[in-house]
Amino acid sequence: MERLSTVRYQRLQVLARADRDAYEAIQWLQKNRGVFEKCVYDPVLVMVDMTRPEAARAIETCLSWPVQRTFVCQTRADYDLFTHELIDKRQWRLNVVEMEGAQPLESYTPPLPEAELRALGFDAYALQCIDAPTDVLRYLCSAAHLHAIPIAFEGRVNPEHMERQRQIRRYISGDTIFTTTFSNYGQRRPQTMSRVLKPLRNLAHVGDMAERERATASLRALQAL
Protein backbone atom coordinates (compact mmCIF):
# COMPACT_ATOMS: atom_id res chain seq x y z
CA MET A 1 0.00 0.00 0.00
CA GLU A 2 2.88 2.39 0.73
CA ARG A 3 4.03 2.07 -2.89
CA LEU A 4 0.81 3.71 -4.10
CA SER A 5 2.74 6.91 -3.39
CA THR A 6 6.41 6.87 -4.35
CA VAL A 7 6.98 10.12 -2.49
CA ARG A 8 5.53 8.74 0.74
CA TYR A 9 7.45 5.49 0.37
CA GLN A 10 10.79 7.24 -0.21
CA ARG A 11 10.31 9.57 2.74
CA LEU A 12 9.34 6.67 4.97
CA GLN A 13 12.65 5.10 4.01
CA VAL A 14 14.43 8.27 5.13
CA LEU A 15 12.79 7.89 8.53
CA ALA A 16 13.48 4.16 8.64
CA ARG A 17 17.19 4.90 8.27
CA ALA A 18 17.45 8.07 10.37
CA ASP A 19 14.79 7.66 13.08
CA ARG A 20 13.64 4.11 13.67
CA ASP A 21 11.33 5.08 16.53
CA ALA A 22 9.41 7.51 14.31
CA TYR A 23 9.19 4.91 11.55
CA GLU A 24 7.85 2.26 13.94
CA ALA A 25 5.39 4.79 15.35
CA ILE A 26 4.01 5.39 11.85
CA GLN A 27 3.47 1.65 11.41
CA TRP A 28 1.72 1.48 14.80
CA LEU A 29 -0.43 4.48 13.94
CA GLN A 30 -1.46 2.94 10.62
CA LYS A 31 -2.92 -0.02 12.52
CA ASN A 32 -4.51 1.98 15.35
CA ARG A 33 -6.01 5.11 13.82
CA GLY A 34 -9.47 4.07 14.96
CA VAL A 35 -8.67 4.65 18.64
CA PHE A 36 -8.23 8.40 18.15
CA GLU A 37 -10.85 11.16 18.06
CA LYS A 38 -9.40 12.74 14.93
CA CYS A 39 -6.61 12.07 12.48
CA VAL A 40 -3.15 12.00 14.05
CA TYR A 41 -0.78 13.12 11.33
CA ASP A 42 2.41 11.31 10.42
CA PRO A 43 5.66 13.28 10.76
CA VAL A 44 5.93 16.55 8.85
CA LEU A 45 8.45 15.00 6.46
CA VAL A 46 5.81 12.53 5.28
CA MET A 47 2.88 14.95 5.22
CA VAL A 48 4.36 17.87 3.26
CA ASP A 49 3.82 18.08 -0.50
CA MET A 50 5.90 20.46 -2.59
CA THR A 51 3.57 22.52 -4.79
CA ARG A 52 6.67 24.25 -6.16
CA PRO A 53 9.41 21.62 -6.43
CA GLU A 54 12.04 24.27 -7.09
CA ALA A 55 11.59 25.39 -3.48
CA ALA A 56 12.40 21.98 -1.97
CA ARG A 57 15.96 22.85 -0.95
CA ALA A 58 14.84 26.12 0.61
CA ILE A 59 12.01 24.43 2.52
CA GLU A 60 14.30 21.68 3.82
CA THR A 61 16.75 24.32 5.06
CA CYS A 62 13.92 26.07 6.93
CA LEU A 63 12.70 22.85 8.58
CA SER A 64 15.05 21.48 11.22
CA TRP A 65 15.25 17.72 11.66
CA PRO A 66 13.26 17.86 14.93
CA VAL A 67 10.47 19.65 13.04
CA GLN A 68 10.57 17.18 10.15
CA ARG A 69 10.15 14.21 12.49
CA THR A 70 7.24 15.69 14.48
CA PHE A 71 3.81 14.02 14.68
CA VAL A 72 0.87 16.44 14.81
CA CYS A 73 -2.24 15.73 16.92
CA GLN A 74 -5.41 17.77 16.48
CA THR A 75 -6.72 17.33 20.03
CA ARG A 76 -5.28 17.18 23.53
CA ALA A 77 -6.98 13.83 24.16
CA ASP A 78 -5.30 12.30 21.10
CA TYR A 79 -1.96 13.76 22.16
CA ASP A 80 -2.32 12.23 25.62
CA LEU A 81 -3.26 8.82 24.20
CA PHE A 82 -0.54 8.82 21.54
CA THR A 83 2.23 9.83 23.93
CA HIS A 84 1.02 7.42 26.62
CA GLU A 85 1.05 4.45 24.26
CA LEU A 86 4.28 5.17 22.41
CA ILE A 87 6.45 7.31 24.68
CA ASP A 88 5.39 6.24 28.18
CA LYS A 89 4.78 2.55 27.49
CA ARG A 90 7.26 1.81 24.71
CA GLN A 91 9.90 4.40 25.60
CA TRP A 92 10.16 5.53 21.99
CA ARG A 93 11.83 8.87 21.41
CA LEU A 94 9.31 10.89 19.43
CA ASN A 95 8.49 14.52 18.74
CA VAL A 96 4.74 15.12 19.15
CA VAL A 97 2.70 18.33 19.26
CA GLU A 98 -1.01 19.04 19.70
CA MET A 99 -2.77 21.91 18.00
CA GLU A 100 -5.97 22.18 20.04
CA GLY A 101 -6.40 25.81 21.02
CA ALA A 102 -3.54 26.99 18.80
CA GLN A 103 -4.09 30.10 16.73
CA PRO A 104 -5.81 29.58 13.36
CA LEU A 105 -3.85 29.38 10.14
CA GLU A 106 -5.45 32.60 8.89
CA SER A 107 -3.88 34.54 11.76
CA TYR A 108 -0.38 33.91 10.43
CA THR A 109 -0.22 36.90 8.13
CA PRO A 110 2.85 37.57 5.97
CA PRO A 111 4.87 40.70 6.73
CA LEU A 112 4.31 42.16 3.25
CA PRO A 113 1.55 41.79 0.63
CA GLU A 114 2.46 39.86 -2.51
CA ALA A 115 2.74 42.93 -4.74
CA GLU A 116 5.35 44.52 -2.47
CA LEU A 117 7.12 41.18 -2.12
CA ARG A 118 7.48 40.80 -5.88
CA ALA A 119 8.72 44.38 -6.18
CA LEU A 120 11.62 43.36 -3.93
CA GLY A 121 12.50 40.49 -6.27
CA PHE A 122 10.83 37.59 -4.42
CA ASP A 123 8.66 34.90 -5.99
CA ALA A 124 6.66 33.56 -3.03
CA TYR A 125 6.59 32.95 0.69
CA ALA A 126 7.81 29.53 1.79
CA LEU A 127 4.31 28.60 2.97
CA GLN A 128 2.97 29.14 -0.56
CA CYS A 129 5.35 26.50 -1.90
CA ILE A 130 3.96 23.57 0.09
CA ASP A 131 0.71 21.80 0.82
CA ALA A 132 -0.27 19.85 3.93
CA PRO A 133 -3.28 19.42 6.23
CA THR A 134 -4.29 22.65 7.95
CA ASP A 135 -3.05 21.63 11.41
CA VAL A 136 0.33 20.66 9.97
CA LEU A 137 0.58 24.05 8.28
CA ARG A 138 -0.39 25.76 11.55
CA TYR A 139 2.43 23.92 13.28
CA LEU A 140 4.93 24.90 10.57
CA CYS A 141 3.94 28.55 10.85
CA SER A 142 4.41 28.42 14.61
CA ALA A 143 7.63 26.39 14.64
CA ALA A 144 9.37 27.48 11.43
CA HIS A 145 7.63 30.77 10.47
CA LEU A 146 7.16 29.64 6.86
CA HIS A 147 4.49 32.31 6.36
CA ALA A 148 7.12 35.02 6.93
CA ILE A 149 10.09 33.70 4.91
CA PRO A 150 10.08 34.85 1.27
CA ILE A 151 11.99 33.06 -1.49
CA ALA A 152 13.61 34.48 -4.63
CA PHE A 153 14.49 31.53 -6.82
CA GLU A 154 16.91 33.42 -9.07
CA GLY A 155 18.68 35.40 -6.35
CA ARG A 156 17.75 38.91 -7.47
CA VAL A 157 17.35 40.34 -3.97
CA ASN A 158 19.60 43.15 -2.71
CA PRO A 159 20.63 42.46 0.95
CA GLU A 160 21.39 46.14 1.62
CA HIS A 161 17.93 47.09 0.44
CA MET A 162 16.45 44.41 2.68
CA GLU A 163 18.27 45.83 5.70
CA ARG A 164 16.61 49.19 5.08
CA GLN A 165 13.24 47.54 4.52
CA ARG A 166 13.29 46.03 8.06
CA GLN A 167 10.01 44.12 7.91
CA ILE A 168 11.53 40.84 6.75
CA ARG A 169 14.14 39.34 9.03
CA ARG A 170 14.78 36.05 7.23
CA TYR A 171 14.67 35.35 3.50
CA ILE A 172 16.12 33.13 0.79
CA SER A 173 17.69 34.41 -2.40
CA GLY A 174 19.04 31.88 -4.88
CA ASP A 175 21.01 29.27 -2.95
CA THR A 176 21.57 31.47 0.12
CA ILE A 177 19.53 32.10 3.26
CA PHE A 178 19.89 35.51 4.93
CA THR A 179 19.07 36.44 8.52
CA THR A 180 19.02 40.10 9.61
CA THR A 181 19.14 41.21 13.23
CA PHE A 182 19.04 44.71 14.68
CA SER A 183 20.88 46.06 17.69
CA ASN A 184 18.76 46.82 20.73
CA TYR A 185 20.20 50.27 21.32
CA GLY A 186 20.67 53.58 19.57
CA GLN A 187 19.97 53.51 15.85
CA ARG A 188 19.29 49.75 15.91
CA ARG A 189 21.87 49.08 13.23
CA PRO A 190 21.26 45.97 11.13
CA GLN A 191 23.57 43.01 10.82
CA THR A 192 22.94 40.38 8.15
CA MET A 193 24.37 36.88 8.23
CA SER A 194 24.15 34.47 5.33
CA ARG A 195 24.80 30.80 4.65
CA VAL A 196 24.37 28.47 1.73
CA LEU A 197 21.23 26.34 1.73
CA LYS A 198 21.59 22.76 2.93
CA PRO A 199 21.96 20.08 0.26
CA LEU A 200 18.61 18.63 -0.75
CA ARG A 201 18.14 15.23 0.87
CA ASN A 202 14.94 14.42 2.72
CA LEU A 203 12.62 16.39 0.44
CA ALA A 204 14.34 15.29 -2.76
CA HIS A 205 11.35 13.11 -3.65
CA VAL A 206 8.74 15.68 -4.59
CA GLY A 207 6.74 13.64 -7.08
CA ASP A 208 3.93 14.72 -9.36
CA MET A 209 0.97 16.40 -7.66
CA ALA A 210 -1.66 14.72 -9.84
CA GLU A 211 -0.10 11.34 -9.19
CA ARG A 212 0.05 12.17 -5.48
CA GLU A 213 -3.67 13.02 -5.44
CA ARG A 214 -4.55 9.77 -7.19
CA ALA A 215 -2.44 7.83 -4.70
CA THR A 216 -4.09 9.57 -1.76
CA ALA A 217 -7.55 8.79 -3.12
CA SER A 218 -6.58 5.15 -3.57
CA LEU A 219 -5.26 4.97 -0.02
CA ARG A 220 -8.49 6.42 1.37
CA ALA A 221 -10.56 3.95 -0.64
CA LEU A 222 -8.54 1.05 0.71
CA GLN A 223 -8.80 2.34 4.27
CA ALA A 224 -12.59 2.62 3.91
CA LEU A 225 -12.97 -1.08 3.06
Task: For every predicted segment, state its role.
Residues 1-9:
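Low-complexity, highly charged intrinsically disordered N-terminal segments
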Residues 9, 13-214:
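Hinge-like oligomerization/junction regions that interrupt long coiled-coil arms in large cytoskeletal
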